[in-house]
UniProtKB/Swiss-Prot annotation:
<dbReference type="InterPro" id="IPR054131">
    <property type="entry name" value="Toxin_cobra-type"/>
</dbReference>
<dbReference type="GO" id="GO:0005576">
    <property type="term" value="C:extracellular region"/>
</dbReference>
<feature type="disulfide bond">
    <location>
        <begin position="24"/>
        <end position="42"/>
    </location>
</feature>
<dbReference type="InterPro" id="IPR018354">
    <property type="entry name" value="Snake_toxin_con_site"/>
</dbReference>
<dbReference type="Pfam" id="PF21947">
    <property type="entry name" value="Toxin_cobra-type"/>
</dbReference>
<feature type="signal peptide">
    <location>
        <begin position="1"/>
        <end position="21"/>
    </location>
</feature>
<keyword id="KW-0800">Toxin</keyword>
<dbReference type="InterPro" id="IPR003571">
    <property type="entry name" value="Snake_3FTx"/>
</dbReference>
<dbReference type="InterPro" id="IPR045860">
    <property type="entry name" value="Snake_toxin-like_sf"/>
</dbReference>
<keyword id="KW-0008">Acetylcholine receptor inhibiting toxin</keyword>
<keyword id="KW-0528">Neurotoxin</keyword>
<keyword id="KW-0964">Secreted</keyword>
<keyword id="KW-1015">Disulfide bond</keyword>
<comment type="similarity">
    <text>Belongs to the three-finger toxin family. Long-chain subfamily. Type II alpha-neurotoxin sub-subfamily.</text>
</comment>
<comment type="function">
    <text>Binds with high affinity to muscular (alpha-1/CHRNA1) and neuronal (alpha-7/CHRNA7) nicotinic acetylcholine receptor (nAChR) and inhibits acetylcholine from binding to the receptor, thereby impairing neuromuscular and neuronal transmission.</text>
</comment>
<feature type="disulfide bond">
    <location>
        <begin position="48"/>
        <end position="52"/>
    </location>
</feature>
<keyword id="KW-0629">Postsynaptic neurotoxin</keyword>
Length: 91
């Protein structure tokens, strides 16, 4: 019985993964960084500026506590797994 209890405790601790923090790509360097405590959402924000036709959309990557508010003309994609927000490929 003690062995079963010990096994359940070990499995519970492994499943809880206490202290886990998300890693997201962050601009301007597009490097993977550990997000601060409480910020478990990765986001990719894209928008066009005056030079969008020649150089493509502007991109902002980062961590957030909640998915950022969507504004007109701005596309936001949010996700919650490690490095799920890579720099978008130009089309």
């Amino acid at each position: 019985m003690k062995t079963l209890l010990l096994t359940l405790v070990v499995v519970t601790i492994m499943c809880l993964d206490l202290g886990y923090t998300t890693k997201c790509y962050v601009t301007p360097d597009v490097t993977s960084q550990t997000c601060p405590d409480g910020q478990n959402i990765c986001y990719t924000e894209t928008w066009c500026d005056a030079w969008c036709g020649s150089r493509g959309k502007r991109v902002n990557l980062g961590c957030a506590a909640t998915c950022p508010k969507v504004n007109p003309g701005v596309d936001i994609i949010c996700c919650s797994t490690d490095n799920c927000n890579p720099f978008p490929k130009r089309s």
